[in-house]
Amino acid sequence: MEHTFIMIKPDGVQRGLVGEIIGRFEKKGFSLKGLKLLTVDQAFAEKHYADLSAKPFFNGLVEYIISGPVVAMVWEGKNVVTTGRKIIGATNPAESAPGTIRGDFAIDIGRNVIHGSDAVESAKKEIALWFPEGVANWSSSLHPWIYE
């Protein structure tokens, strides 16, 4: 099964959207494998967003991520990276469809509530960074009702 990294950003935590977001992934049929509520320091945020370090918005993004607690999660499921991105919606909330997390809960790109891995390889890298101790090894009893 595929894994993805999902992070509820400080605005999502402050606005009380954690349960709603987890519920959307669970209702889809994905399995939660790892979960942490934490605050990160600047060095860690810079490492997470290293691929964006040359972008003009990089410093603001780092400040935003360290401004409050985040919820870091690992989800498992068939095509979870691609499907997770569809659940989240476009990076720019103005381009996100209603029914997506960003389409329903975000207005500005700089406060877009949630991060999700954009590819299987980036998911592996992000999971290794955020969950160096690994994740829970369990299988949902619902798998036969979700997967062929």
From Swiss-Prot:
InterPro entries, A to Z: NDK-like_dom, NDK-like_dom_sf, Nucleoside_diP_kinase, Nucleoside_diP_kinase_AS
Highest rank taxon of the organism: Eukaryota
Q: Which GO molecular function annotation, any one, does this entry have?
A: nucleoside diphosphate kinase activity
Gene Ontology biological-process entries: CTP biosynthetic process; GTP biosynthetic process; UTP biosynthetic process
- Would I find Ribosomal protein among this entry's keywords? no
* Cofactor(s) listed in the protein's UniProt record: Mg(2+)
Instruction: Cite the entry's keywords alphabetically.
Output: ATP-binding, Kinase, Magnesium, Metal-binding, Nucleotide metabolism, Nucleotide-binding, Phosphoprotein, Transferase
Which top class of enzyme applies to this chain?
transferase
Q: What is its EC number?
A: 2.7.4.6
**Recorded catalytic activity of this chain's protein:** a 2'-deoxyribonucleoside 5'-diphosphate + ATP = a 2'-deoxyribonucleoside 5'-triphosphate + ADP; a ribonucleoside 5'-diphosphate + ATP = a ribonucleoside 5'-triphosphate + ADP
Tell me the residue numbers annotated for binding ATP.
K9, F57, R85, T91, R102, N112
Instruction: Give the annotated active site.
Output: H115 (pros-phosphohistidine intermediate)
Q: Report the family membership.
A: Belongs to the NDK family.
Q: What's its job?
A: Major role in the synthesis of nucleoside triphosphates other than ATP. The ATP gamma phosphate is transferred to the NDP beta phosphate via a ping-pong mechanism, using a phosphorylated active-site intermediate.
Q: Which PANTHER family match?
A: NUCLEOSIDE DIPHOSPHATE KINASE (PTHR11349)
UniProt-recorded name of the protein: Nucleoside diphosphate kinase B
Please tell me the species this chain comes from. Answer: Flaveria bidentis
